[in-house]
């Protein structure tokens, strides 16, 4: 029981669950307003991390991005028996791809905040799947981001990552309203 309380306390500190006095815990609400603020913060931090990674990254970093993109593009997006549910192998490969993009960033605080924002956005990403499958080419979005980053084109990379994130936000917001 102590381990469960500790886990719930940690999830509460991360904003994923809400503690209710004398009533236990509930999963934090999702809302278009929360998603818009989260996306705004995430885009700003992600772009800063990308800028630093592009400035500092070398051949190993580029190789890691190409490998992560290859892995992601060869991983099933949704569950074979339920196309409305993300395949957890894809979720892991997606996380690794986005981590690889910024892995050459040398500011650990920016990376830490980026990781927290990524984790927060995951629950919204899960919501986007049944709403958007036909109207978006996520694989092409990832290729565009990787191409811009490896080309060291900061403006194009920042625009591509922002578009990628705001597209998810738009899809979820439409579904929530």
What is each of the regions a protein language model found here?
Residues 50, 55, 59-126, 139-148, ...:
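Conserved amphipathic alpha-helical segments that form helical-bundle/coiled-coil interaction surfaces
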Residues 17, 135-136:
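Short secondary-structure boundary/capping segments
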Residues 32-35, 62, 154:
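Short functional linear motifs
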Residues 1-55, 169, 173-177:
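Short linear motifs at protein or domain termini
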Residues 31-32, 124-128:
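Short alpha-helical transmembrane interface motifs in multi-pass membrane proteins
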Residues 130-134:
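Solvent-exposed loop and edge beta-strand segments that line ligand/cofactor-binding
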């Amino acid at each position: 029981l102590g381990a469960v309380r500790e886990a719930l306390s940690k999830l509460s500190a991360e904003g994923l669950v809400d503690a209710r006095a004398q009533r236990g815990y509930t999963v934090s609400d999702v809302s278009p307003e929360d998603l818009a603020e989260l996306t705004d913060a995430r885009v700003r931090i992600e772009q800063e991390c990308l800028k630093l990674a592009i400035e500092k990254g070398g051949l190993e970093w580029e190789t890691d991005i190409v490998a992560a993109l290859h892995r992601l593009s060869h991983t099933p997006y949704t569950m074979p028996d339920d196309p409305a549910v993300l395949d957890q192998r894809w979720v892991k490969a997606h996380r690794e791809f986005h981590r690889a993009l910024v892995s050459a960033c040398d500011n650990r605080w920016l990376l830490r905040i980026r990781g927290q924002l990524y984790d927060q956005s995951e629950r919204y990403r899960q919501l986007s799947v049944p709403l958007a499958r036909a109207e978006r080419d996520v694989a092409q979005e990832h290729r565009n981001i990787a191409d811009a980053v490896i080309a060291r084109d900061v403006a194009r990379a920042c625009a591509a990552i922002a578009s990628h994130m705001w597209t998810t936000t738009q899809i979820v917001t439409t579904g929530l309203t």
